[in-house]
Amino acid sequence: VSQIVESGMLMNDRPAVLRRRSWSVIFGIAVVGLGIGMFIAVLKVTSMSGFRTGWQGIPVYLVIAGLIGRIVNCKVVLREDVLTVINPLRTHTVPRAVIDSAAPGEDGGLEVTLSGGRTVPVFAYGGSFIDHFRGTSGAAAETINRWLRTGSDPDGSSAGAAVSWTRCRPADVAVLSGVLLAGGGALWMALTGG
Protein backbone atom coordinates (compact mmCIF):
# COMPACT_ATOMS: atom_id res chain seq x y z
CA VAL A 1 0.00 0.00 0.00
CA SER A 2 1.49 3.33 -0.96
CA GLN A 3 -0.43 5.54 1.41
CA ILE A 4 -0.94 5.64 5.12
CA VAL A 5 -4.10 6.83 6.76
CA GLU A 6 -2.83 7.35 10.26
CA SER A 7 -5.24 7.11 13.18
CA GLY A 8 -8.27 6.62 10.94
CA MET A 9 -10.67 9.33 9.90
CA LEU A 10 -10.56 11.69 12.86
CA MET A 11 -10.83 8.94 15.43
CA ASN A 12 -10.58 10.17 19.01
CA ASP A 13 -10.27 13.77 17.79
CA ARG A 14 -6.95 12.94 16.12
CA PRO A 15 -6.30 14.06 12.56
CA ALA A 16 -6.07 11.65 9.64
CA VAL A 17 -2.76 11.81 7.78
CA LEU A 18 -2.46 10.82 4.12
CA ARG A 19 1.06 10.13 2.86
CA ARG A 20 3.04 7.69 0.77
CA ARG A 21 4.53 4.90 2.83
CA SER A 22 7.06 4.23 0.08
CA TRP A 23 8.64 7.67 0.56
CA SER A 24 9.59 6.90 4.15
CA VAL A 25 11.18 3.61 3.07
CA ILE A 26 13.00 5.27 0.16
CA PHE A 27 14.19 8.07 2.47
CA GLY A 28 15.59 5.61 4.98
CA ILE A 29 17.39 3.62 2.29
CA ALA A 30 18.69 6.78 0.57
CA VAL A 31 19.97 8.44 3.74
CA VAL A 32 21.67 5.30 5.02
CA GLY A 33 23.03 4.39 1.57
CA LEU A 34 24.25 7.91 0.86
CA GLY A 35 25.70 8.12 4.36
CA ILE A 36 27.69 4.92 3.94
CA GLY A 37 28.78 5.90 0.43
CA MET A 38 29.76 9.40 1.52
CA PHE A 39 31.67 8.05 4.53
CA ILE A 40 33.65 5.69 2.28
CA ALA A 41 34.28 8.50 -0.22
CA VAL A 42 35.48 10.87 2.52
CA LEU A 43 37.84 8.17 3.86
CA LYS A 44 39.19 7.42 0.38
CA VAL A 45 39.73 11.07 -0.57
CA THR A 46 41.25 11.79 2.85
CA SER A 47 43.70 8.89 2.48
CA MET A 48 44.76 10.13 -0.97
CA SER A 49 44.66 13.92 -0.57
CA GLY A 50 44.36 14.56 3.15
CA PHE A 51 41.46 15.73 5.26
CA ARG A 52 41.75 19.21 3.75
CA THR A 53 39.99 17.84 0.65
CA GLY A 54 38.19 14.84 2.15
CA TRP A 55 35.85 16.71 4.50
CA GLN A 56 34.05 18.42 1.60
CA GLY A 57 31.71 15.48 1.07
CA ILE A 58 30.15 15.86 4.52
CA PRO A 59 28.21 19.10 3.85
CA VAL A 60 27.08 17.72 0.49
CA TYR A 61 25.62 14.68 2.26
CA LEU A 62 23.88 16.85 4.87
CA VAL A 63 22.25 19.08 2.24
CA ILE A 64 21.09 16.10 0.13
CA ALA A 65 19.67 14.36 3.24
CA GLY A 66 17.86 17.59 4.18
CA LEU A 67 16.32 17.96 0.72
CA ILE A 68 15.18 14.33 0.71
CA GLY A 69 13.74 14.86 4.21
CA ARG A 70 11.65 17.81 2.99
CA ILE A 71 10.18 15.63 0.24
CA VAL A 72 9.37 12.80 2.65
CA ASN A 73 7.68 15.29 5.00
CA CYS A 74 4.96 15.95 2.39
CA LYS A 75 1.47 14.86 3.44
CA VAL A 76 -2.18 15.82 3.71
CA VAL A 77 -3.64 16.26 7.20
CA LEU A 78 -7.42 16.11 7.69
CA ARG A 79 -8.57 17.76 10.90
CA GLU A 80 -12.13 18.42 12.01
CA ASP A 81 -12.76 21.46 9.79
CA VAL A 82 -9.36 22.10 8.18
CA LEU A 83 -7.34 20.36 5.50
CA THR A 84 -3.59 20.99 5.56
CA VAL A 85 -1.43 20.26 2.51
CA ILE A 86 2.24 20.09 3.46
CA ASN A 87 4.46 20.44 0.39
CA PRO A 88 8.29 20.68 0.43
CA LEU A 89 8.41 24.49 0.66
CA ARG A 90 4.85 25.73 1.27
CA THR A 91 2.05 24.58 3.58
CA HIS A 92 -1.56 25.30 2.61
CA THR A 93 -4.12 25.38 5.43
CA VAL A 94 -7.60 25.30 3.95
CA PRO A 95 -10.93 25.44 5.83
CA ARG A 96 -13.43 22.76 4.79
CA ALA A 97 -15.91 25.48 3.81
CA VAL A 98 -13.76 26.70 0.88
CA ILE A 99 -12.94 23.26 -0.57
CA ASP A 100 -15.01 22.08 -3.52
CA SER A 101 -13.38 18.70 -4.15
CA ALA A 102 -10.21 16.70 -4.60
CA ALA A 103 -9.31 14.78 -7.74
CA PRO A 104 -6.32 13.49 -9.67
CA GLY A 105 -5.09 16.08 -12.18
CA GLU A 106 -4.26 15.45 -15.81
CA ASP A 107 -0.70 14.45 -14.87
CA GLY A 108 -1.95 11.94 -12.27
CA GLY A 109 -1.07 14.15 -9.31
CA LEU A 110 -3.61 15.02 -6.64
CA GLU A 111 -5.21 18.46 -6.68
CA VAL A 112 -7.57 20.06 -4.18
CA THR A 113 -9.99 22.46 -5.87
CA LEU A 114 -11.14 25.46 -3.85
CA SER A 115 -14.22 27.59 -4.38
CA GLY A 116 -13.42 30.10 -7.07
CA GLY A 117 -11.58 27.50 -9.16
CA ARG A 118 -8.15 27.81 -7.55
CA THR A 119 -6.32 24.51 -7.10
CA VAL A 120 -3.78 23.44 -4.51
CA PRO A 121 -1.35 20.80 -5.83
CA VAL A 122 -0.46 18.02 -3.41
CA PHE A 123 3.23 17.12 -3.79
CA ALA A 124 2.77 13.98 -1.65
CA TYR A 125 0.69 12.58 -4.52
CA GLY A 126 2.60 14.15 -7.39
CA GLY A 127 1.63 11.76 -10.17
CA SER A 128 4.50 9.31 -9.98
CA PHE A 129 4.88 6.45 -12.43
CA ILE A 130 3.45 4.07 -9.82
CA ASP A 131 0.38 6.31 -9.43
CA HIS A 132 -0.74 5.51 -12.95
CA PHE A 133 -0.91 1.80 -12.07
CA ARG A 134 -1.87 1.87 -8.38
CA GLY A 135 -4.23 4.85 -8.38
CA THR A 136 -2.95 6.26 -5.09
CA SER A 137 -3.89 9.83 -6.03
CA GLY A 138 -7.44 8.67 -6.76
CA ALA A 139 -7.64 6.83 -3.44
CA ALA A 140 -6.40 9.90 -1.56
CA ALA A 141 -8.93 12.06 -3.45
CA GLU A 142 -11.73 9.67 -2.41
CA THR A 143 -10.63 9.91 1.22
CA ILE A 144 -10.61 13.71 1.09
CA ASN A 145 -14.01 13.84 -0.66
CA ARG A 146 -15.47 11.45 1.94
CA TRP A 147 -14.05 13.75 4.67
CA LEU A 148 -15.75 16.71 2.93
CA ARG A 149 -19.13 14.91 2.88
CA THR A 150 -19.01 13.68 6.47
CA GLY A 151 -18.16 17.00 8.07
CA SER A 152 -20.45 19.52 9.64
CA ASP A 153 -22.18 22.06 7.43
CA PRO A 154 -20.02 25.13 6.89
CA ASP A 155 -21.18 28.09 8.94
CA GLY A 156 -19.87 30.63 6.44
CA SER A 157 -17.52 32.21 8.97
CA SER A 158 -14.42 30.39 7.76
CA ALA A 159 -11.56 32.44 6.41
CA GLY A 160 -9.83 31.65 3.15
CA ALA A 161 -6.84 29.43 2.63
CA ALA A 162 -3.61 30.38 4.38
CA VAL A 163 -0.17 29.70 2.92
CA SER A 164 3.01 29.56 4.99
CA TRP A 165 6.55 28.26 4.71
CA THR A 166 6.83 24.57 5.54
CA ARG A 167 8.83 23.78 8.64
CA CYS A 168 10.59 20.44 8.81
CA ARG A 169 13.00 20.61 11.71
CA PRO A 170 15.21 17.55 10.93
CA ALA A 171 15.56 18.52 7.27
CA ASP A 172 16.16 22.17 8.08
CA VAL A 173 18.81 21.27 10.68
CA ALA A 174 20.56 19.01 8.14
CA VAL A 175 20.60 21.72 5.44
CA LEU A 176 21.67 24.43 7.89
CA SER A 177 24.42 22.17 9.28
CA GLY A 178 25.65 21.46 5.76
CA VAL A 179 25.74 25.16 4.87
CA LEU A 180 27.46 26.13 8.13
CA LEU A 181 29.97 23.30 7.80
CA ALA A 182 30.75 24.28 4.20
CA GLY A 183 31.18 27.94 5.19
CA GLY A 184 33.28 27.10 8.23
CA GLY A 185 35.38 24.65 6.24
CA ALA A 186 35.96 27.16 3.45
CA LEU A 187 37.04 29.73 6.04
CA TRP A 188 39.33 27.16 7.70
CA MET A 189 40.89 26.32 4.31
CA ALA A 190 41.39 30.01 3.50
CA LEU A 191 42.98 30.77 6.87
CA THR A 192 45.29 27.75 6.92
CA GLY A 193 46.39 28.24 3.30
CA GLY A 194 48.27 25.73 1.27
Q: Can you say where each PLM-predicted feature lies in the sequence?
A:
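Hydrophobic alpha-helical transmembrane segments
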Residues: 27, 49-61
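A broad, low-specificity signal for short, low-complexity segments enriched in glycine/proline
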Residues: 35-48, 60-64, 69-74
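Acidic, Ser/Thr-rich low-complexity segments on the non-lumenal side of membrane proteins
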Residues: 92-125
